[in-house]
Amino acid sequence: MAPFDPTGYWSSLVTQNWRLRMVPPAKGDYIGIPISAAGKQVADAWNQAKDEAAGALCKAYGAPGLMNLPTHLHITWQDDNTLRVETDYGAQTRVLHFGGWTPPQAHKRSWQGNSVASWALRRGGRVGPPAARYLRITTTDLLSGYLRKNGVPYGENASLLEYVDLFKEPTGRDIIVWTAVVDDPVYLETPYIISSQFRKNADALAWEPTPCSAGW
């Protein structure tokens, strides 16, 4: 049994890095990202028109950066061991597998990769009781893509580790904090940590699926 209920509709709270999340960053703007020399070379050569012509606009909607986009989430249980996370922004779907799931031998790389999830225990201190349980997600088998819409890259060797925590506002509304740790041995000098917040909605009125795009 899940220690907290992540299902429902959620809206992104853009309370940090508003400029970088709400306005397409300029080419060569990789502030805040521990980008390597190889990563800079790729980012500086980025060509938006080339991506558009190739039908590759979803490269910025892969799992490593998806939750940091200004999106709404729709989270449901696909079955007892599979959590489905949909975004209206870019119309992406992530599938989180529980229960010791392993990818099939003939698996393919994709923007969202293959994700294995589990519930973990976060303790309050050495002698205190457990503070909370959180969701831990490990994702591999990613297609190469962008951490931002201006071509800051991650490669197929990148791995993604995520932590999802539930909190309550003073008003009683649920907030989830989704923290992503992107590790790329080629394009990043150190792991890149991104934290995003979502507030639970009472209904689906804000849900509006849109395709991948170069703008916002």
Regions found by a protein language model. Give the residues of each.
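PEST-like low-complexity, intrinsically disordered acidic/proline/serine-rich tracts
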Residues: 1-216
